[in-house]
Amino acid sequence: MNRRLAMGSLLVAAAGLAAAAIGWRRRQGALPPQMALAPRVVLSPPDSIGAVYHLGHSLVGRDMPAMLAQFGGHGYASQLGWGTPLQTHWTEGEALPGYELHASGIPPAPARQALAADGFDVLVMTEMVEIRDSLRYFDSPYWLAEWAALARQGNPAIRIYLYETWHNLDDPDGWLERIDADLEAHWLGRVIAPAEATGRSGGIFLIPGGQAMAAVARAAEAGDLPGLTSRGDLFARTEDGGLDTIHINDLGAYVVALTHWAVMYQRSPVGLPHQMQRADGSVAQGFGPEAALRVQQLVRDVVAALPQTGVAPARMAG
């Protein structure tokens, strides 16, 4: 055997061992290594946004995109499932559990079909929570990159965002504690950074929904929001009247919609309307004027503090 063949054999063997090791780690449910996120560029403010695609699950829901569109005036479409990871959205499509399509101002369309065409200015994705399980078992960064690459084939100028969410209020590690810790450790360091490292995704920016929810919850519990006293005031109720520990109510949807708008439109949300409609046209529960103004200020401050959004802090002045 000559030297080239010998080296080739060694490389093949090494690759096989590496693949086996990766497979073993995945079977064991180990988290992938955390990566440093590349420095963010500051995005230019959009000239206009005509259409937005939302890909996710019930923490996107029907009403939050509808509120966002009321702020921005854009059309939107969404593909949702029950706690669906990005991988399952790709591999199962309309067969995924809880499959739903929604739209306003534009026709509804399955995600892969819609994004392959040049019809959307913005794609917002989110990942299944528990986020650690998405990373262990559903290869979040690979599928984030896959969706981003598809969207850029349809529209090379599309802006792509990952919507950071939250875990259950009764999470054993603490709800606020998880939001504080998971942003850098998981959403940025284990989802966005390795997705971008594939070289297929282009830049992916952050919509800090969890951070905004945490800021508003802290303000409520500090007595800084008239009419609210706890984080539970942002969450829905179950059919028997108990607290739904993961799904937001109209007030929570308003917080998240403000956050999306501030990032996507690169404008301070201070002064936006606080009386909104749900997706079905019914009147949403709203903050009072004083509380709404404070919530808008909190969201503005969250977005301004995070360069991962692509928003220059000066854009949040006001």
Task: Tell where the protein language model's regions lie, with residue ranges.
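N-terminal export leaders
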Residues: 2-12
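Core hydrophobic alpha-helical transmembrane segments of single-pass membrane proteins
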Residues: 11-19
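Membrane-interface motif at the C-terminal end of an N-terminal transmembrane signal
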Residues: 19-31
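N-terminal module-boundary/linker segments of secreted carbohydrate-active enzymes
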Residues: 32-66, 70-71
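Conserved SGNH/GDSL esterase-like catalytic core that processes O-acyl groups on lipids
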Residues: 55, 61-147
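Alpha-helical cap/lid subdomain in secreted, periplasmic
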Residues: 109-250
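Conserved catalytic region of serine esterases and O-acyltransferases that act on ester linkages
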Residues: 231-318
